[in-house]
Amino acid sequence: MSTSGATDGMILVPDPADRDDLRTLLRRILRLDEAAVVRLTSVDEGRMRVWARTPFGALAVRVLRGDCPGGDVVCGADHLLTELDILPRGDADGALDPGMPLLSAWQGLLPPADGFHPVENVPAQVLLDLTESGRTAARENAGPAGLPPSLLDQVALTVRADTDAPVGIDMRTVFSLVMCGFVPERGGKAPEGEPVRVSERGAWLRIDARYGTVYRRTARKRRRYRLGENLPPER
């Protein structure tokens, strides 16, 4: 795919289906945060990741076919959505102007690309049910400052619960995954047997659904010392 001439410095999404997927993602992100920025990074030839930080504190990402200038660009989600809306559907290049560079508006590091270890698969319906319960609780408990942190920080689901290293998934992660549209559903029901995969690497938790992934950085695990074992010296 050429990025020379008229398409220099442009985001290229040539397939109308991928543009539709990008448009849907941007609309969902803007519904959560009208001032959201998105970060596009290259995966390999002809594919890119579209990142957004949700207001719940998790990172959402979807892989689409396309190219981004320099392999890494940050732009306003509303600007990119406008670019998509004015682009003719039959446009062959799918060239989108990223607008003014906004790299300084992106906060935080991106997670590692690989090295995650599988923890457990969870039925997607469980995540949908938790989201509906969370929405009900939010309507009942939201105040002038928005949702109470106690609701968002609540561990909604524990996987690998029968081991000495359980993994807790909070409502921030659940809300981010479902509200970004990553879990397929119709009328609040996921396809029968639809899985969501949970994996981890160090302090990073990763949740993969059919249409996208959510990452959440958790508190680093502390080593547990057995009775009688020497503790490290105080610093």
Predicted regions and their residues:
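A short, sequence-level motif marking secondary-structure junctions
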Residues: P55-F56, R65-C68, A219-R224
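Long, compositionally biased intrinsically disordered terminal regions
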Residues: R89-R235
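N-terminal ordered "arm"
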Residues: M1-R65
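Short, surface-exposed, polar/charged, turn-prone segments marking secondary-structure boundaries
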Residues: L40, D67-G70, E234-R235
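A broadly used, surface-exposed interaction patch
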Residues: L59-L96
